[in-house]
């Protein structure tokens, strides 16, 4: 029995299916054969393109599989069987994961977003999904780039500064941090 990714993800930060074995048929949207990820992202065929509400479940998920990362490519239709788990606040399918190529999946679309969701719940609705920012963003943090492939983005053309980068410790720095949280 196939389980849709949205059911695996659920509408809360933690999957309702943790420690359960699932099988799902989806489209590969990213592969990470090097750099420590050792896996792929998959998304429900035909999904994407429409913005989600914070209460919606995501249609994408990470699959921890060294074999898959080296043998499938973006756009492939795959059957994935493995165990649902949470890893550093990320829902993934892992364990003794089985990934097989197949045919017949409708392509996925990137969901265009003028602004990225500001809340954890808003971002959770897009966890693991293909998104396409459509407005201007500035890289504001690259600390996790080499290890995790992550960059921090800020809306507009101004990076977010740490309070003490632009003000002395105390009220001035605190005001900068308050302004950052409001963005």
What are these regions (language model features)?
Residues 1-183:
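Extended non-catalytic accessory segments flanking core domains
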């Amino acid at each position: 029995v196939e389980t849709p990714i949205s059911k695996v993800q659920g509408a809360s930060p933690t999957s309702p299916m943790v420690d359960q074995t699932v099988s799902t048929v989806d489209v590969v949207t990213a592969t990470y054969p090097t750099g420590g990820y050792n896996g792929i992202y998959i998304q429900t065929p035909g999904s994407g393109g429409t913005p989600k509400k914070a209460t919606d479940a995501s249609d994408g998920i990470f699959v921890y599989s060294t074999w898959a990362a080296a043998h499938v490519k973006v756009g492939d239709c795959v059957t994935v069987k493995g165990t649902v788990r949470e890893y550093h606040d990320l829902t993934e399918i892992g364990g003794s994961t089985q990934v097989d190529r197949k045919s017949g999946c409708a392509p996925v679309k990137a969901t265009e977003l003028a602004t990225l969701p500001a809340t954890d719940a808003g971002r959770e609705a897009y966890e693991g999904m293909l998104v396409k920012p459509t407005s201007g963003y500035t890289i504001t943090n690259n600390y996790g780039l080499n290890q995790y492939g992550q960059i921090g983005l800020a809306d507009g053309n101004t990076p977010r500064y740490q309070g003490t980068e632009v003000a002395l410790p105390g009220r001035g720095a605190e005001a900068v941090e308050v302004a950052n949280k409001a963005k």
